[in-house]
Design a protein with these regions (language model features):
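N-terminal basic, Ser/Thr-rich segments that initiate or prime the first beta/alpha elements at protein or domain
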Residues: 1-161
């Protein structure tokens, strides 16, 4: 667990599930399989020069796979007394602080690959798109619990306004 100074104190950031890496790599492999197989077929049937395109596609797939692995490692979140904070990115960093009082609703979404790995995405909606956020790669039970807790905190904060 990494700590970062925010508001003058060291805070424990919660990482997302490592299963998110596997799920995203499966999606990448499925997406790249069609063009790679197509270039192999064309190289075998028409001209061997297409092997260059096959090699390029394989290298691109490997590079994107590495980037995905690093990217997922940079996603974390924390619940603060007044806001929920999502941190993403190593090169293009973003830090989204969502005040509980601005929460409109919270969704839990999970596609077929994510469900197979037992993970879901938590999507937090506010009136402003700039203060909304998505937190991918949470274990399904944790995402459901967090959704319930955030919705309750949002309702309590709005009632106090």
């Amino acid at each position: 667990m990494e700590t970062v100074t925010l508001r003058g104190g060291d805070l424990p950031w919660q990482p997302v599930s490592p299963a998110l890496v596997r799920a995203r790599l499966i999606v990448l492999a499925l997406a790249m399989a069609i063009p790679i197989v197509a270039t192999i077929v064309v190289a075998l049937v028409l001209t061997p020069w297409v092997w260059i395109a096959t090699g390029i596609l394989i290298v691109v797939t490997a590079v994107v796979g590495y980037v995905v692995t690093r990217q997922v490692g940079a996603i974390s979140w924390i619940e603060l007394p007044e806001e929920f904070v999502i941190r993403k990115g190593r090169v293009l960093r973003s830090l989204v602080a969502i005040p509980y009082g601005r929460l409109q609703f919270v969704d839990v979404q999970s596609g077929p690959v994510a469900r197979a790995y037992g993970i879901a995405s938590l999507q937090i909606h506010t009136a402003s798109p700039q203060s909304s956020g998505t937190l991918p790669g949470l274990p399904i039970a944790q995402a459901e619990e967090l959704r319930t807790r955030l919705a309750a905190l949002g309702e309590a904060q709005r009632a106090g306004l």
